[in-house]
């Protein structure tokens, strides 16, 4: 038996946790993709698509990052970003959502960066739970 789990299992564990947090998955968090995981993923996608239809589509990078958030956070991010983007454009700038959900490993990598970019380690950031996004303003 292997000492570590596969990347697929790690990804599935992570996805099952997010699905459970969003209320779309009630099975065991076991890293095994099954019907419960698939059904939860379909419900997630249905809600995400509905929120996208309500606000319209944004640029590719923003869409990619919004799609990593919990569906209710996607809704909030879309509503907020629509206003922020319009204000940025009115002032001659461009706005993008540059980050959404991060894994614990990604969060720890940011935590170790110098100069310091975050005070949160993996598991301590709202990004790790699909509830936060970062944005950038560009010329």
Question: What residue spans do the PLM features occupy?
Answer:
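Short acidic, glycine/serine/threonine-rich helix-capping segments at coil-helix boundaries
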Residues: 3-62
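Charged, low-complexity surface segments at secondary-structure and domain boundaries
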Residues: 1-2, 139
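Cell-envelope/glycan interface and biosynthesis
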Residues: 47-139
